[in-house]
Swiss-Prot record:
The keyword Ribosomal protein is assigned to this record: no
Pfam families named in the record: Chitin_synth_2 (PF03142), Cyt-b5 (PF00173), DEK_C (PF08766), Myosin_head (PF00063)
Membrane topology category: Multi-pass membrane protein
Taxonomy of the source species: Eukaryota, Fungi, Dikarya, Ascomycota, Pezizomycotina
Protein name: Chitin synthase V
Keywords, in A-Z order: Actin-binding, ATP-binding, Cell membrane, Glycoprotein, Glycosyltransferase, Membrane, Motor protein, Myosin, Nucleotide-binding, Transferase, Transmembrane, Transmembrane helix, Virulence
Gene: chsV
Catalytic activity: [(1->4)-N-acetyl-beta-D-glucosaminyl](n) + UDP-N-acetyl-alpha-D-glucosamine = [(1->4)-N-acetyl-beta-D-glucosaminyl](n+1) + UDP + H(+)
PANTHER family assigned to the protein according to its UniProt record, in alphabetical order: CHITIN SYNTHASE (PTHR22914:SF45)
Expression induction or repression: Expression is increased in the presence of sorbitol or the tomato phytoanticipin alpha-tomatine, but does not depend on the fmk1 signaling pathway.
Family under the similarity heading: In the N-terminal section; belongs to the TRAFAC class myosin-kinesin ATPase superfamily. Myosin family.
Record: glycosylation sites: N63, N123, N429, N483, N522, N560, N1036, N1063, N1192, N1459, N1565, N1771
Places the protein is found: Cell membrane
Residues annotated for ATP binding in this entry: G104, E105, S106, G107, A108, G109, K110, S111
Length: 1862
């Protein structure tokens, strides 16, 4: 049969041929096909065809719906519609599933063609359902499409869009549903937008399309975070990306309306927008490193080192509050969660304390999780509303569109790039299979031969990447599941692919760095995959972690408490696959968002019979395989096995979903079409064709090979002969078999050979030929079924959707874990009649505000802060508490409660009460400060008011000479500043020079200013003649300044003489001049002491008296100093009585009582008020000479000496402190001691260097190693900032404990809220060897219950102390113990070999403290010397003294606080603060054994859990070590606490201001509250007034009044600076004595460096004594209050409620040691009887519980033994100090030790075998060089097993053989 290719195009040039296979054979190369495409492109024909199977579309970067003539004919849209028509015809007439697969690079226009195709398909069913399906596609694109460097609409998620049809009733398929399956959204883009690209479009839609009211609600109005006009959003890239030609505002409206038409309620749309806004705000969070200034609410209190804990906090709290409100959580919880991250490391939960960069990444994880879950929820909700039940779906049309091949990843995510390229590789392989291999088997079975066509086969790459089990993605998933490292993954790839697969090359895991001769780990290692589109290098660094895509349990735990139902639904959907704790199924450890869709293609999940399949053997085999696959899929999905979530990472899930796509497309019942989208150029230039660019794409996709294949075999269908003949109306051909008749028909049709072939049982046809015989031309509409089958009756008027009830079908959902309801209810299911749903609900959203009538952001925030509380305790307030509360309300009554709640933002009543208490305490403190200030300044001024008076001698000292204090003069009792007046003297130096004026300085110049008597005095009659004059007194007498005599008239007086008789009379001139002097230049008044006034009257006969503090002199008046003087030229008038103008009674007073204070007489003088007023005016203006000087009066002397007495008393305390510091003599050398001591270190997040220094310093102490026990308590599984391992692992590595030792966690009581009182811990023990010291140790690791996700086990330093205190308390009182305490007892007694009761002392240091080698010895010596000593501390110095200015100012303060304050308190045997960083306590009394430090009262008070008042918070959360000392003084008042300067340690002081401020706030406030606790105690010892109570009171008072003291010093300095004549000598002498005595101390101790430190300390006094106290007092309530609170109950009771649940003490079983020991003894004895091998007798003892449950309940797996040997009988026998009552080897049931476990003995060689081999080795070994270690290594080589567990036996056997004992 001749082959001919029909011309499918019309007449014209070559470009008119749209079908590439129709071109001549010589034009079938890449170059020629590219040229052909170019010729079509240039005439606006951007499409071509590969027969009927595929469309080739070139992106014109213009309107894709316009063809060459302006219509759609010839356009890309027309090509897509043609494919839609073909698919729809095949769907309706053959009931085949249809699939359209898109291929092309990014920017080739796949999304556009896909949209045209979908529109064309949906237009064939113009119903509301089709509209919804179209809108669903728009929603998908909005959520998953972005703008990249190559295209403005780049899809970043694989799409499998399934349109569901019912084809059972008619050849016109009925659209009944749809399904959107998204595959692997590019999540890395959310938090890391590439430069020059955009994030997903919907985020920009939200920002551009919301109204102002909506923006305000969402916090998008730019009012927060920055002060700039345009806010830069981190997650939206560069601001230029907001304006790139995309109409985002319109897009948002369409998006919103699409959701509404898809039946999303308005509230849900608003919630969606809030989540999107939250994601934007998460990008705005700014983090900083700070110090935790307050104890967290669920913490027991205390800090494990000086200062505080370094944490990461959010800077912009306003942004944080917006996010928290929308997520329905509290802002504090959100900040805490972002600052920590919990991981699983070696099967342990570990919380990492993140730095700001880590917190930023954690916030990015939250953003990615929110967006991924939101997309998954929206799509699943759409699917629930649009997807038809599987049983009703007859056929489907699937659109497959995955992102294009990616040569380089813009987001930096190697995983996204790998999975993306894996998908393109798979889809390309599907394409090749469809054209080259799909019909090959059937052609062969039908005995049809087709000429082979060569093509590029990417099967190697597909197998290498996608093969289940050992493909690249499977290996990546397997390595992720096994927690392998990146390098281990690389090695796994090498073993799998090296030399076995040409498509994958594995790079080297090691590399030689420049300048190095050694191979090191290659941090830039890659593996290379040869994809069909080119080679790509994939870095392995971080790939394993990225593939895990772990969402930390912290985020899940936070969201678990959300008050937002919508957020709960997001995190409750199956897309979130959770991993639960193996022992606590309700606890989610971590999770991941699924990388595969929640549904499978209907082809994969439908069990109905697929019609239209040929019944050949091959097809039957395929059908059976598919049905079997369906059954397996259904069974696997129905189980909903949570293990799936544990088994599969992102690559495994994506591989499974890709496999579903592959099987759906290659299903025998599926007909596939392909759309090749090509870019005409790389620069996105419209109408420009780059031949090189296009040829590369044609070559990459193998279009030339496909075209050649179609030229030889273009078969689309296989029709059995009967069906074929029935369709061709071949009844007229009556002769021949079916085959012959078919051949005759084909010959008659003259179809080309490549489109039709006759096989053994049927005919292979192209789609064109089939359409011809089926009479399906362009205008053909066939209503019936082909093949003569009767059509169903569809005349009932109902669509299939209407004729059946659609329920929620979830059979096809992929399992999402076994806890779908953890975060809320499942999403609503169900779908109702598709075409009858009203769309009237789609309307405007609240008039431009979709949040109208919904909760405001403030309401959301308030709801997020609410906690679900449960009653846990009931109690009554103590009377003292009631009295205090009454006082608080009395002091703060004027502050209304609502003001505190609203303005202070304190919704909780207990927090408001604490704030009131703080205010009340501050008021009391300031009252005391005011009293102190009053006594220092106000009291002397009140008793002796300050007088501005000058005696004659003082005035004379102001003579203006060099060295004098100034130039003052006196005028009628008033002292004037001459220096100030001279510059303003009129008429200036022209008349009287300045020197002349200065000659008057220091003198009384009253004579210079003659007075007009009549102008200054009205006399007794109301008028005095103007001629009356009064001479001025000459006061030039002994002891007085040189004054001008009245008779020696000064020549300058004439310038001031304006009396009546002069020619220039000015009566008021003197008054006016004096007014100016008094108000401008007045410095004071002349002062005359009462004694001196009497002397003047007695010795000089002055008529001088004192009236109300004023001194008057009437001597001249009485001695005739008055006369009349008329104007020149006029006679002197004779006026009787003119010079007698004063009342006789007044004159008589001066005569009879001169020298006396006549105030009383003056008050009783018999004058009318008018006359008395006149007389007083005359006295003041004419006879006043000064004030009474009382500065040396008795009253003033009392005020001075009263203050001096107080100063002396305080100075005496200073002297005692000085003497106390001196009384310590030199250091004596202590003797060797035999007391047992526990050395405890509480560890939290310290670095390895600090921990090692602390541990080594304790181990190297000069004290018998076997009598000290090193106890390290690790407070939780936490990785501190800067650490690479959790703190417990660091400690265990230092101590040499192998990672293989993993004891069972055991329960014990902790200090926490509610259920957090139940904690679990692990016990490790062993020997630590350092510098010749071998010290037994025990490590207690608090790991927390399985239900604890964040910071597991962490309860605070006080709880760490209580672990040991409670244990020792129960040991000494023989009380029942918890499982962990029993294990501690066992480890100490049977492993370490010392009875716990033997330990007498507890030595406690911090993890950053280093102790001197003799410190423990000196402290224990003091305990032995004084049996009444209960506790002591030593001197603590700084190791980082020169670290910063902050540390420098603390050096001297540390030194004097010990050597003065503590030394002084030690005199009385009551040191009020024993620092937790360096103290030793007496556990029990030496004589009686009575518990002291661990007595019931102290343990009970110190373990207080209910810390709900301000006082208790300050006691237990700020100064737990000081409170512990307070309890010792309170309950053991007969015992002493001392300070030993000979014991020394060094610690690290805060080196930053924030940490220093935090530390001092805690110290100052705890000091105030602890001293307040001590003052009421009646048992405080002491003698006379120097009792301990007095010392405590002085300490408390000095702490409180520090700010006033500083202010007083400033006041003194000001006084000296402003008035040099007044120097408070006493005050400065005291200040000098304070520091002088301190200097004496460090000089005597030869601490010369303290001179410099003292100067720095003095400079910092304002900080220490003023700034810090003020800050501390006001921040007294600065706490994280947790969620436990107190509410009022009935009958005056208080109810404690907590969100941590109620703790049941019975949940922790307890046993006495004797009972526990008896059980162990019985079990051990039985085991020893049954076990032949005594070496492992400890094994069955340790695993005596045969059932599935632990001895202590809880349903956990039986524990495994942790250790079976103690210190070893040969080498460590000296350690067996206490008799062991355990038979056999010492073994731990639960604890871990560094020796070996019975598990390690399984499979070990026997001792006899080892001994024989050792003999053999020693026979040939060089005995001069052989070592035990070498023998052990040789034995391990021979037996091929590690022999660490047999080390002790090997060593002892070797010694025995060498010594001849064996």
């Amino acid at each position: 049969m001749a082959m001919s290719l029909p011309q499918l195009g019309g007449a014209g040039g070559p470009h008119t041929q749209p079908s590439l296979p129709s071109l001549p054979a010589h034009l079938q190369s890449d170059t020629h096909l590219t040229a052909h495409l170019a010729s079509r492109f240039h005439v606006s024909h951007p499409t071509a065809r590969l027969s009927s199977h595929a469309l080739i579309s070139l992106n014109t970067y213009t309107n894709s719906s316009k063809g060459p003539d302006g219509g759609k004919e010839g356009s890309a849209m027309a090509g897509a519609e043609e494919i839609a028509d073909r698919a729809f015809l095949r769907l309706g007439h053959r009931s085949e599933n249809q699939a359209v697969v898109f291929l092309g690079e990014s920017g080739a226009g796949k999304s556009t063609i896909r949209a045209h195709l979908l529109t064309a398909l949906l237009n064939k069913s113009s119903t509301p359902l089709s509209t919804k399906l179209s809108l669903a596609a728009y929603v998908f694109d909005s959520l998953t499409t972005t703008k990249t460097a190559t295209t403005p609409t780049a899809s970043k998620s694989g799409l499998f869009y399934e349109l569901q049809y019912d084809t059972s009733a008619t050849t016109n398929p009925v659209l009944i549903g749809g399904k959107l399956l998204d595959h692997r959204l590019e999540r890395s883009r959310i938090a890391d937008v590439p430069t020059g690209e955009r994030n997903f479009h919907v985020l920009y839609y939200l920002l551009a399309g919301t109204s102002e009211a909506e923006k305000s609600h969402l916090g998008l109005d730019g009012g927060s975070a920055t002060g700039t006009t345009q806010k830069r959003w981190k997650y939206l890239g560069h601001p230029t990306q907001l304006k790139v030609g995309i109409n985002d505002a319109e897009g948002f409206q369409v998006f919103k309306n699409a959701l509404r038409k898809l039946e999303f309620p308005r509230a849900e749309i608003a919630e969606i927008c809030q989540i999107l806004a939250s994601i934007l705000h998460i990008g705005q969070l700014e983090f900083e490193t700070t110090s935790q200034t307050s104890v967290t609410g669920d913490d027991s209190g205390g800090f494990s080192h000086e200062g505080g804990t370094t944490i990461t906090a959010v800077k912009n709290k306003d942004v944080l509050s917006i996010i928290a409100a929308f997520l329905g959580v509290s802002a504090a919880d959100l900040q805490t969660t972002l600052g920590y991250k919990t991981k699983m490391i070696h099967r342990e939960r570990v919380t990492v304390m993140l730095d700001p960069n880590g917190a930023r990444a954690h916030a990015g994880e939250l953003a990615r999780t929110l967006y991924s879950l939101l997309v998954a929820w929206i799509l699943e909700t759409i699917n629930q509303r649009l997807c038809a039940p599987e049983e009703s779906i007859a056929n489907t049309v699937s659109i497959v569109d995955f992102p294009g091949f990616c040569q380089q990843t813009p987001t930096g995510s190697a995983l996204d790039q790998l999975l993306n390229n894996a998908a393109t590789e798979c889809i390309y392989n599907l394409t090749l299979q469809n054209f080259f291999d799909r019909k090959a088997d059937m052609l062969e079975s039908e005995e049809v031969s087709v000429a082979a066509t060569s093509y590029f086969d990417n099967s190697d790459a597909v197998r290498g990447i996608l093969k289940p089990g050992n493909g690249l993605l499977s290996i990546l998933d397997d390595q992720t599941r096994r927690n392998r490292t990146d390098m281990q993954f690389l090695e796994a790839l090498r073993r799998r692919f090296d030399g076995k697969n040409a498509a994958i090359e594995v790079g080297s895991a090691q590399a030689k760095l420049p300048g190095s001769n050694f191979m090191t780990e290659n941090t830039s290692a890659v593996f290379t995959v040869k994809h069909f589109a080119g080679e790509v290098d994939y870095p392995v660094k971080g790939l394993i972690e990225e593939n895990g895509e772990i969402i930390s349990g912290d985020l899940l735990n936070m969201i678990n408490g959300t008050k937002s139902e919508f957020v709960a639904r997001l995190f409750g959907q199956d897309a979130l696959q959770t991993v639960t704790h193996p022992n606590e199924r309700t606890t989610v450890m971590q999770a991941t968002v699924s990388s595969k869709p929640m549904r499978a293609p209907s082809v994969m999940s439908r069990k109905t019979h697929r019609t239209g399949r040929p019944s050949t053997a091959y097809k039957r085999q395929q059908q059976e395989a598919m049905e079997e696959l369906d059954q397996q899929s259904q069974a696997g999905e129905s189980k909903k096995n949570a293990k799936m979530t544990l088994e599969q990472g992102a690559s495994g899930q994506f591989l499974a979903s890709l496999d579903n796509v592959q099987k759906a497309v290659t299903d025998p019942g599926t007909n596939s079409y392909f759309v090749f989208c090509l870019k005409p150029n790389d620069r996105r230039i419209a109408n420009q064709f780059d031949s090189k660019c296009v040829r590369m794409q044609v070559q990459t996709f193998g279009i030339a090979e496909i075209s050649q294949r179609l030229r030889s075999a273009d078969f689309s269908l296989f029709l059995p002969f009967g069906e074929f003949l029935g369709m061709t109306d071949a009844e007229t051909i009556l002769v021949g078999s079916e085959r012959e008749r078919a051949e005759m028909v084909i010959e008659e049709k003259q179809w080309p050979q490549n489109e039709v072939r006759v096989g053994a049982t049927g005919v292979f046809l192209s789609e064109r030929c089939w359409m011809e015989i089926a009479q399906l031309g362009e205008a053909v509409s066939v209503s019936g079924r082909y093949g003569g089958l009767p059509s169903s009756d569809a005349g009932d008027g109902l669509t299939p959707a209407e004729s059946m009830a659609f329920g929620a079908s979830k059979e096809h959902l992929v399992s999402g874990g076994n806890t779908p309801l953890m975060y809320g209810e499942k999403a609503k299911g169900g779908y109702f009649t598709d075409d009858t749903r009203s769309e009237a609900g789609v309307s405007a959203f609240g008039g431009g505000d979709m949040f109208k009538n919904l909760d405001t952001r403030e309401q959301m925030a308030e709801r997020g802060n609410e906690k679900s509380l449960e009653e846990v305790e009931e109690y009554r307030d103590k009377p003292s508490r009631k009295r205090w509360v009454a006082l608080v309300f009395f002091l703060t009554w004027f502050i209304p409660d609502f003001a505190i709640r609203l303005i202070g933002r304190m919704p909780r009543k207990d927090v408001r009460m604490a704030w009131r208490e703080k205010v009340a305490i501050n008021m009391l403190i300031w009252l005391m400060c005011a009293v102190a200030a009053f006594f220092m300044v106000g009291f002397p001024m009140l008793i002796c008011p300050k007088q501005y008076v000058y005696s004659s001698n003082e005035l004379s000292s102001y003579d203006g000479d060099k060295g004098s204090k100034g130039a003052y003069v006196a005028i009628r009792g008033f002292v004037i500043d001459l220096n100030a007046f001279i510059p303003n003297h009129y008429p200036g130096s022209n008349l009287v020079s300045e020197d002349t004026l200065l000659n008057y300085a220091g003198k009384d110049i009253s004579a210079l200013f003659p007075i007009q008597v009549s102008a200054l005095c009205q006399g007794k009659d109301g008028q005095i003649p103007p001629e009356v004059t009064l001479d001025n007194r000459n006061t030039n007498i002994t002891g007085q300044p040189q004054l001008l005599a009245s008779r020696d008239i000064d020549v300058n007086s004439v310038y001031h003489d304006f009396r009546y008789f002069t020619n220039d009379s000015r009566p008021d001139w003197y008054f006016e001049q004096m007014y100016t002097f008094k108000h401008v230049y007045l410095k004071g008044r002349m002062g005359y002491s009462p004694k001196y006034v009497k002397k003047l009257a007695r010795d000089s006969s002055w008529n001088v008296v004192t009236i109300h503090g004023k001194v008057y002199d009437m001597t001249k008046y009485l001695q005739g100093g008055l006369r009349l003087k008329a104007k020149a030229g006029k006679p002197t008038p004779n006026i009787p009585g003119a010079t007698d103008f004063m009342e006789d009674s007044v004159v008589q007073l001066f005569r009879s009582a001169k020298g006396q204070d006549v105030s009383k007489y003056w008050d009783n003088i018999k004058l009318s008020p008018v006359k008395k007023q006149r007389m007083e005016t005359c006295l003041n203006n004419l006879f006043y000479i000064g004030d009474s000087d009382t500065r040396n009066s008795t009253r003033c002397q009392f005020a001075t000496y009263f203050i001096l007495a107080i100063s002396v008393m305080l100075a005496s305390i200073l002297v005692f402190k000085f003497l106390a510091a001196l009384q310590f003599g030199g250091k004596n050398v202590p003797e060797n001691l035999d007391k047992f001591v526990m050395c405890m270190i509480p560890a939290y997040t310290e670095d390895e260097d600090s921990l090692r220094r602390a541990i080594d310093s304790l181990s190297r102490m000069k004290y018998d190693d076997k009598r000290k026990l090193l106890v390290v308590v690790c407070d939780g599984m936490i990785i501190g900032q800067g650490n690479d391992r959790p703190t417990p692992r660091i400690v265990l590595d230092i101590l040499g404990v192998s990672e293989t030792v993993d004891p069972e966690p055991l329960s014990f009581e902790s200090l926490g809220e509610g259920m957090k009182q139940h904690n679990m811990g692990k016990i490790y023990s062993g020997l630590y060897e350092v510098q010749g010291h071998i010290v037994p140790f025990m490590v207690i690791v608090k790991v927390g219950k399985p239900s604890e996700v964040s910071r597991p086990g962490n309860r605070g330093k006080r709880d760490s102390q209580m672990v040991l205190m409670r244990f020792l308390n129960r040991v000494h009182y023989n009380l029942a113990m918890s499982p962990m305490e029993l294990e501690m007892y066992h480890q100490i007694r049977n492993i370490i070999g010392v009875n716990p009761t033997f330990y007498e002392y507890l030595f406690q240091i911090d993890a950053d403290t280093v102790v001197a080698a003799d410190s423990a010895t000196r402290m224990i010596s003091a305990f032995i010397d004084d049996t009444r000593l209960i506790a002591c501390c030593g001197e603590t110095a700084l190791t980082n003294a020169k670290g910063s200015f902050i540390t420098m100012i603390q050096v001297y303060e540390y030194w004097i606080s010990h050597n003065l304050s503590k030394a002084f308190e030690s005199l009385f045997g009551s040191v009020t603060c024993l620092p937790g960083c360096f103290s030793m306590y007496r556990i029990r009394a030496a004589e009686t054994g009575k518990p002291l430090f661990v007595s019931k009262e102290i343990v009970e008070d110190y373990s207080t859990i209910r810390v709900d008042t301000l006082h208790m918070k300050n006691l237990l959360h700020l100064g737990e070590d000081r409170y512990l000392t307070t309890l010792l003084l309170k309950y053991h008042s007969k015992y002493k606490t001392k300070y030993l300067f000979s014991a020394q340690a060094w610690t690290i002081a805060p080196d930053s201001w924030s940490v220093f401020l935090s530390q001092r706030r805690r110290w100052i406030n705890s000091t105030v509250h602890n001293l307040a606790e001590l003052i009421p105690l009646a048992q405080l010892c002491g003698f006379c007034c120097f009792s301990m109570r007095f010392v405590v009171f002085i300490d408390l008072l000095s702490t409180i009044v520090q700010p006033v003291i500083v202010m007083y010093i400033v006041y003194l300095i000001y006084q000296v600076a402003t008035n040099p004549s007044v120097v408070p000598i006493t005050a400065f002498l005291l200040l000098g004595a304070i520091y002088g005595l301190q200097a004496v101390i460090f000089i005597l101790r030869r601490k010369w460096e303290m001179v410099g430190w003292m100067i720095m300390y003095i400079a910092a006094i304002p900080v220490f004594s003023f700034g810090l106290p003020l800050y501390s007092f006001w921040h007294m309530d600065d706490f994280n209050w947790g969620n436990t609170r107190v509410i009022a109950g009935e009958a005056g009771k208080k109810i404690v409620v907590s969100d941590e649940g109620k703790f049941d003490p019975n949940s922790i079983p307890r046993k006495k040691w004797e009972e526990y020991q008896a059980e162990l003894w019985e079990t051990q004895t039985q085991t020893a009887r049954d076990d032949v091998r005594s070496e492992i007798s400890g094994y069955s003892y340790a695993t005596k519980a045969q059932g599935p449950f632990s001895e202590y309940g809880g349903g956990y797996q039986p524990s495994r033994p942790g250790s079976t040997a103690g210190f070893g009988h040969q080498n460590m026998s000296r350690m067996s100090l206490a008799h062991s009552e355990m038979p056999g080897n010492r073994a731990s049931q639960f604890g871990g030790s560094q020796f070996f476990s019975p598990e390690d003995l399984v499979g070990m060689p026997s001792d006899d075998a080892l001994l024989a081999e050792i003999r053999d080795i020693l026979k040939t070994a060089d005995l001069m060089t052989v070592t035990k270690k070498g023998i052990k290594q040789e034995l391990e080589r021979r037996f091929n097993v590690p022999l660490d567990a047999k080390r002790a036996y090997i060593n002892s056997a070797t010694e025995a053989l060498l010594s001849g004992q064996l």
